[in-house]
Amino acid sequence: MAKYILSCCSTADLSKEHFDKIDVKYICFHYELDGVEHPDDLGQTMPFEEFYRKMTEGAATKTSQVNSDEYYDFWKPYLEQGSDILHLTLSSGISGSVNSANIAREDLEEEFPDRKLYVVDSLGASSGYGLIMDTLAGMRDEGRSIDELHDWIEQHKLDLNHWFFSTDLTFYIRGGRISKTAGTVGTILGICPLLNMDDEGRLIPRSKIRGKKKVIQEIVKRMEENAQDGLDYSGKCYISQSACMEDAEAVARLVEERFPKLDGKVEINYIGTTIGSHTGPGTVALFFWGKRRQG
C-alpha cells in the first residue's frame, strides 16, 4: 500500500502535542491583532490566555485563510518524497479555504500525475474538525488505505455533531451577528444563544436559553438526543472553549455522568485564534458522533 499523510488546517483546534501524537500535519491560518499579523499556530506564538485577554481589553481582530501558494508549498515536499495526501479543510460554510486548496491541488496534480492528492471539505470546525482528523488517524493506523479513508469521510462527515453556546454576546454584537439592541437586551437578561452546524457546515442559531446553568443542561440534552446509540454512546467526545474553562469542565462532567460508555474522558481544547477572533471569550462547543446533520 502506498504511503500517505493526513493533513488539515490549524483551525481543527487540537493541541500541537495531539497532532504530533497522531501524526497529522497541519497548515496555519493567520490572524491580525491590532494590525499585527500572527500565525494561528495552536497557541505557540501567542498563548491563548494572552490572546483572549487582549480581545477583552478591546484589541481589534481580523482573520485570513490559507492561500493557494501556501497550500502548494505545504504539500509539495510530501509529494516529492513519494507520499499521497488526504487533506481536510475548514468548513466551506464559514471559510473559502477549500477553494484555495483546490487551486493548489490542480497545479500539483499536473506536476505529480502519479500521486494522489485528495481535498475534502470537512463541513466541520474547531475540535469537531479535530475529532474527524483523530478518527481518520486511527483508521490509518489500522491499515486502511487512503482511498478507504477518503470514501469513508465523504460518507460520514455529517455524522459529526457540532453544538455551541456563548455566555458573552460582546463579540457577536461587534461582528454584526447580533444587533446592538438585541445584544444589550440579551446581556441584561442573561441570554445564551445555542447554535449548531448544519448540513452545509454553517453555524445556525437554534435556541435562546436564559442562564448559564440552563444552557449547560440544554447542550448536553442535545447530545442525549443526537448521539450515536443515545446514552450508550461509546465514541469520543471533545469540547472546545474560549477562555471559559469552568463552563467547559461543567459540560464535560455532565457528559461523563450521562454517558458512562464514552471512549475515554472528554477532551477539552482551546478554541483557536482564528475561530476565537469571531466568537470572543465565553464560547463552549461540544462535539460527538451521532445522527446525520440536517439543515
PLM segments and residue spans:
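A short glycine/small-residue-enriched secondary-structure motif
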Residues: T45-Y52, W75, E80, D107
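Glycine-rich phosphate- or other oxyanion-binding loops that anchor nucleotides, phosphorylated ligands
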Residues: T56-S92, N99, I103, H150
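Short beta-strand->loop
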Residues: T89-S91, V120-L123
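Positions that flank functional sites
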Residues: D34, G93, G201
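Short beta-strand/turn micro-motifs composed of small residues
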Residues: C8, T89, Q241
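N-terminal glycine-rich anion-binding loop in soluble enzyme alpha/beta folds
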Residues: I5-Q65, E70
